[in-house]
Amino acid sequence: MTLQNDSGDEPKLAKNETIKEASNLLRGTIAEGLLDDSTGALASDDTQLTKFHGIYQQDDRDIRRERRKAKLEPAYSFMTRVRLPGGACTPQQWLDMDAFCTDYANGTLKLTTRQAFQLHGIIKKNLKLTIRKINDSLMDTVAACGDVNRNVMCNPNPNQSRLHAEALEVARAISAHLTPATRAYHEIWLEDENGEKQKITPDPEPEEEPIYGKTYLPRKFKAAVAVPPSNDVDLFANDLGFVAVIEDDEIVGYTVTVGGGMGMNHGQAKTFPRLADVLGFCTPEQVTDVAEKIVTTQRDYGDRTDRKHARLKYTIEDRGLDWFRGEVESRLGYALGQARPFEFDHNGDRYGWVDDENGNSHLTLFIQNGCVVDTDEFPM
């Protein structure tokens, strides 16, 4: 769609929009920057693109001043975030991540509030190897950050019941369906044993992003799947939510919520926290289709002129829920069902032991600040 302001003129787009459009589907000059050993940093525009690859450029703030006095560039390093729908990983993947944080990062494994891993303190020369090792462990970092759908949250213990396991598979399906289609990630970060670029398909032409388009979303997009009575994913704080509707011990579908988000900028009335609205109901088979059409509606109508006003919650607040539902249903080609009732009786993590339906016990631990690190005060 073409953006217009009240005067009929096309408004000025946010800088990130021009960076994305000129990036050749998230390539930019990242590959060239990785080869430049004259600096520990990447080009400024490329640091906006690496977010889509799950990577943030950072520097050590504690020594900025002394490095500036010594006429040295900042002590640059990188954080990489590992996307894991529902936060579910195998024991071997956990051990691998523990090894990676010691071998390539600063020794601390971070567990995020959105159920992802983070490694901090990776220097540029180790960045590509770290990403390859993560992928060798059957995990990835693509779409863990950036203006796309990010890690899809779900109940943290899929072994709790058959229904929880089913919900995790739905979260994984949403994540896979909304993953960017660009081959840039594989081209830049992954090579075979001969140093050749890996290709996931044999040179399909032309390359395109069928869901996101070449400028992706106006802003980040967060999704979650909840299994009542637990609202452990803070469903109403997400752009998109699916609440399992359970009848006769079966998930018969999902009540869909849209437009949540707790972020705001103080002193700016145009930004505010907002709880999600209930949009309707869909069957399990319709989940990825519904998710896609909600994302493409935000892609086309979200605010690309002001990143502080670019989340889905503002699109719905400005245009109305009825308009949004109509636009989504027009793209679906069918109407959403009447929302089914559900009830949450708690939120947050339930620490301690929980028994599953097979009689096994599972322990949820409190991890202070999400940091897994061996210290003298608390050796691990």
Named regions from a protein language model:
Residues 1-380:
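Peripheral terminal and linker regions in Fe-S/redox and tRNA-modifying enzymes
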